Amino acid sequence: PNNVASRLYIFGTKGSAVGSLIWIFLLVGVLAVGTVQLGNAILYAFGWNATWERWVLFVGISCVWIFMALFGTKVIARMNAAFVVALFCVMGYVVYLIAANGQMGDALTHGVMIPGVEVGQGFAYGVNYAIMTSGLLALFAGDFTRYARKESDLIPIAGVGSLFAVITYLFGALITYFGFSQAVEYFSAQGYDATGAAHAAITNPGISLVLAAGGVGLAIICLSQMKVETSNSIGGANAVTNLFDSLFGVKLSW
């Protein structure tokens, strides 16, 4: 996100500001979405509905991202593997519950779950999302292997990343199905109409993990999101640093 490659080899110092603006928009947006998803899971788990509780929670979560970006990167780097394994274990448990309840057939064959959305629209969204994640996977694979001894090391990393991306898509779809009805009821009680409640239910899978695993599921969501959003906070800060340096010659010292 600090645009080193584009700054040195493509766009130059001034031109790299465009890349910084794109990264800032992308990372801040992803950070906001992740914060809302985590916050909704916590609100659901504890039954908090008051406006002041929402304000305190979301401000508190944002402060945690800042604190972890400044002081917690080493801890997260050491615990990252455990977080990922724990998350996949919980997702696997949800899939087991679906199979045990005899719902696997319905979970794999149901139609579009949001009222008013046509099959073609859903397919277009799926293709668009796949394009976006493929680009991110390529970026991360290139970033993780930039110090590799040979170019062929990129192949297994990119392959494993793509495989687990597909597995995550499948698990995510099943998890969304598992808690869809309860999540729709929850968001309907918050004042959403049928379409809005269905959309919110699909985009907040953390509620399904809370339904399946209770406090354990919530804890794993928090830890997993902590790693992702800390990385996004650092990436956003790097992009802002490059933006100020490329446009104004100001070197931010954070």
Identify the residue ranges that each predicted region occupies.
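Flexible loop linkers connecting adjacent transmembrane helices
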Residues: P1-G19, I42-G47, T73, I157, ...
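Helix-loop-helix connectors at the membrane interface of multi-pass transporters/channels
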Residues: V4-L8, V36-R54, T230-W254
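Helix-loop junctions at the membrane interface of multi-pass solute transporters
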Residues: A5-Y9, I66-F67, G126-A158, Y177-F178, ...
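Select transmembrane alpha-helical segments in multipass membrane proteins
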Residues: K14-F25, F58, G116-V127, G206-S224
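Transmembrane alpha-helical segments of multi-pass small-molecule transport proteins
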Residues: S20-W23, G47-F71, V85-V94, G122-A141, ...
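Membrane-water interface regions at transmembrane-helix termini and the short interhelical loops
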Residues: Q37-W48, S62-F83, F140-K150, N242-D245
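Hydrophobic alpha-helical segments and their helix-loop junctions in multi-pass secondary transporters
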Residues: A69, A86-M113, G126, A130-T133, ...
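TM-loop-TM module centered on a large, flexible mid-protein loop between adjacent transmembrane helices
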Residues: F171-T230, D245-S246
